[in-house]
Amino acid sequence: MTILNIAAVDLGASSGRVMLASYSTENHKISLEEIHRFKNQFVSQNGHECWDLAYLENEIVNGLRKISNSGRTLHSIGIDTWGVDYVLLDQNGEVVGPTYAYRDHRTDGVMQKVQAELGKEVIYRKTGIQFLTFNTLYQLKAMTDENPAWLSQVKDFVMIPDYLNYRLTGVINREYTNATTTQLVNVNIDSWDTALLDYLGLPASWFGRIRHPGHQVGLWENRVPVMSVASHDTASAVISAPLSDENAAYLCSGTWSLMGLDTTTPCTDECAMNANITNEGGIDGHYRVLKNIMGLWLFNRLCTERDVTDIPALVKQAEAELPFQSLINPNAECFLNPSSMVEAIQQYCREHNQVIPKTTAQLARCIFDSLAMLYRKVALELAGLQGKPISALHIVGGGSQNAFLNQLCADLCGIDVFAGPVEASVLGNVGCQLMALDQIHNAAEFRQLVVKNFPLKQFKKRPHFMPASDFEEKWCEFCALN
């Protein structure tokens, strides 16, 4: 029996891991082992929020060396990260300028300026990407306006996972799923939109050819293949979401919550634009028609501010609080990166004549209720786009462990919710590597392996969780916030 040892590097906005997947080519068992975990956080450079690339590279290599030093033969490596953030390289492959983080405030007001100059509908028809203030399009516009002197130094533009692959292999590869998060890829041709690049005043030569995942980029230390995976972590997570049928939706639940459909065609009509739906690239010729929701970022910040160490206990305390006393719009800009999340929530409730949550449990309940309400709203929008009701919701990622929020989601959306796998991005990363290693052929085949190896938990709508008239009142209150 042959065991393939596959390293999946999974970087998030607050932490990173090097995971080792062991895959049996005989019985198709997959096991996961965390080899190395490290913190990730913004670093301040000249008043801007940035990423420390040298630190990330060093931690990744530390994790890979731990595997090598354990005596196990490593068969391949893949890296996935968040989207939208990029690196500029000069002709020697050295980094030009800081590597800004998407929560940096330099893009404040830039999106509105670009929309006014180009036209919102024009941008959306070209790219199919939802309008978020930190999309790469607006980051680059801020850069060209503020630091035009850098332009003459730059030879290559790469996304962060492509940069890390380059550091491991010396080879530049521009991976499709992450490239689509930039709002610079034309959804009709799956290539860079030259008109948008011209608008920014940037040469097409910076950007190079986009390639789909599932192939070898190069070798680490001249011996271990580094594979191009679905390097946007959400794209990897969707690969491992064991969708029950074509009308099932997924919810990648973590720092961000991303709810969507796995489709063969993008949706860029006026209804999709008005709903701020995004059409990000997937694999096997599919698109991720989805919506970004601020997600557990709000809860994580609450726990940090209130020094919460026992998160399961706080979730239970929140469950015991009265429901729907305070509702917020989790996607409101004031929650993107406030100096105090507690104060931001309380101020929002004050401005919208809501009950002001004070205790940590009340604040947590406010967050969970509001997220579940927003999940319901997005599910209804997605159903409207596809012309069919959502049949089931598959919640994957770390947030799928929150049974209370899963149950709220089933109650409010009125459909069965299936939770798991927890390590969705890691598994999707592994799945792409297995495709590159010719062990499996497509996402559908890999999802069957996921179900066999990682049991799901099912949540059904409770028939009498709240009187219909009371809920309708709260639902109307929430919709008025959006």
Curated annotation (Swiss-Prot):
It catalyses: L-rhamnulose + ATP = L-rhamnulose 1-phosphate + ADP + H(+). The active site is at D233. Disulfide bonds join C349-C366, C409-C413. Substrate binds at G83, H232, D233, T234, N292. GO terms for biological process: glycerol metabolic process; rhamnose catabolic process. GO terms for cellular component: cytosol. One of its GO terms (molecular function) is rhamnulokinase activity. InterPro entries: ATPase_NBD (IPR043129), FGGY_N (IPR018484), Rhamnulokinase (IPR013449). ATP binds at A13, S14, S15, G16, R17, T255, N300, G398. Keywords: ATP-binding, Disulfide bond, Kinase, Nucleotide-binding, Rhamnose metabolism, Transferase. Its cofactor is Mg(2+). CDD domains: ASKHA_NBD_FGGY_RhaB-like. Its EC number is 2.7.1.5. Pathway: Carbohydrate degradation; L-rhamnose degradation; glycerone phosphate from L-rhamnose: step 2/3. Belongs to the rhamnulokinase family. HAMAP family: Rhamnulokinase (MF_01535). Involved in the catabolism of L-rhamnose (6-deoxy-L-mannose). Catalyzes the transfer of the gamma-phosphate group from ATP to the 1-hydroxyl group of L-rhamnulose to yield L-rhamnulose 1-phosphate. This is Rhamnulokinase.
